[in-house]
A protein has these predicted regions:
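Substrate-binding groove of N-acetylhexosamine-processing glycoside hydrolases
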Residues: 1-135, 247
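Short secondary-structure boundary/capping segments
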Residues: 4-5, 206, 225-226
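Glycine-rich, flexible loop segments associated with nucleotide phosphate handling
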Residues: 14-18, 40, 144-151, 202-208, ...
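A short, polar/charged loop/turn motif at coil->beta-strand junctions and beta-hairpin connectors
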Residues: 38-40, 124-126, 144, 154, ...
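Mature N-terminal, pre-catalytic/accessory segment of carbohydrate-active enzymes
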Residues: 103-156, 194-195, 235, 261, ...
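Short, solvent-exposed coil/turn elements at secondary-structure transition points
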Residues: 136, 215, 224-227
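Aromatic, loop-rich ligand-recognition surfaces of beta-strand-rich domains
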Residues: 157-222, 233-271
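Short proline/glycine- and polar residue-rich coil/turn motifs
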Residues: 227-233
């Protein structure tokens, strides 16, 4: 029961993002599997958990056309798979399913991945050194690649489980300082956060952006207060500053409100 398209365009799901293309890319016999074990793989299986699926029609939407992708995975040699070709055929199958009275996902109007997530972006802080404040380290299980994750130019997708979103649950949540290596003209600093209330992932209640030339004394550029409201939607919000400043160090702090939980952000973009 993972979202198969942009969460705000879909009924509430358990979480995650599993589009048709990702199902089609699944390899049930990975290269790491030894030859004597390959013969033990007899087929594939997909499960649909229905805690958030109230009707048969909803279940059909979650199954079709993703089950068609899994079927082709099962009977096709990976070397002959072609997603573009499959996608064209899947569009026709969706129409055929509708004609038979089923309720498949509207593949023709698929929104696709989160904007910016398909290719790296460039900005002033990409590749710069990042340090984390005391009691504000990222959670090891959601490191997104480690200390460089927030300045690697990689934008997160629709789910915090895609290994692109860095998670914070330490006492002071998020306190990140970027060393620009030299005094740099800065016109904007911003970061996106996501909220998914079910697994206790919330927006920050306060964000502070500040700068420094010595890395010790910081001047506050902007302080943002945000009232965190629980709802059933997956939401994304940018907290940023725009203006004119010149500094070597940029500090980005974000704290949690009354609900606690995780903070997740994917990139601190500096322009």
């Amino acid at each position: 029961d993972s979202y198969q398209d942009a969460p705000d365009s879909q009924p509430e799901a358990i979480g995650g993002y599993l589009p048709l293309a990702k199902v089609y890319s699944f390899n049930p016999v990975p290269d790491t599997l030894s030859a004597d074990k390959v013969q033990l793989v007899y087929g594939v299986q997909a499960n649909l958990f229905t805690e958030y699926i109230p009707t048969p029609e909803h279940a059909e939407m979650m199954i079709y056309p993703r089950i068609l992708a899994l079927a082709e995975v099962a009977w096709s040699d990976p070397s002959v798979k072609n997603y573009d070709d499959f996608h064209a055929r899947a569009l026709k199958e969706v129409e055929a399913l509708k004609a038979e009275g089923y309720h498949p996902f509207d593949l023709k109007n698929e929104i696709g991945n989160r904007p910016g997530a398909d290719q790296p972006i460039q900005h002033l802080a990409v590749g710069k050194k990042v340090t984390y404040g005391p009691d504000a380290a990222y959670y090891p299980g959601y490191s997104a690649g480690g200390d460089s994750a927030l300045v690697d130019g990689v934008i997160g997708g629709w789910t915090y489980g895609d290994k692109r979103w860095q998670g914070f649950i330490d006492k002071k949540r998020m306190d990140v300082t970027i060393d620009m290596e030299k005094e740099t003209e800065i016109h904007s600093v911003g970061a996106d956060f996501m909220q998914v209330c079910g697994p206790e992932v919330f927006m920050p209640s306060e964000v502070i952006i500040s700068v420094s030339n010595d890395g010790k004394e910081f001047t506050e550029l902007k302080r943002m207060e945000h009232k965190v409201v629980k709802d059933d939607k997956v939401t994304f919000t940018n907290f940023g500053w725009e203006g004119n400043a010149k500094a070597r160090y940029i500090r980005y702090q974000a704290s949690s409100g009354e609900f606690g939980g995780f903070l997740f952000t994917d990139e601190i973009v500096v322009k």
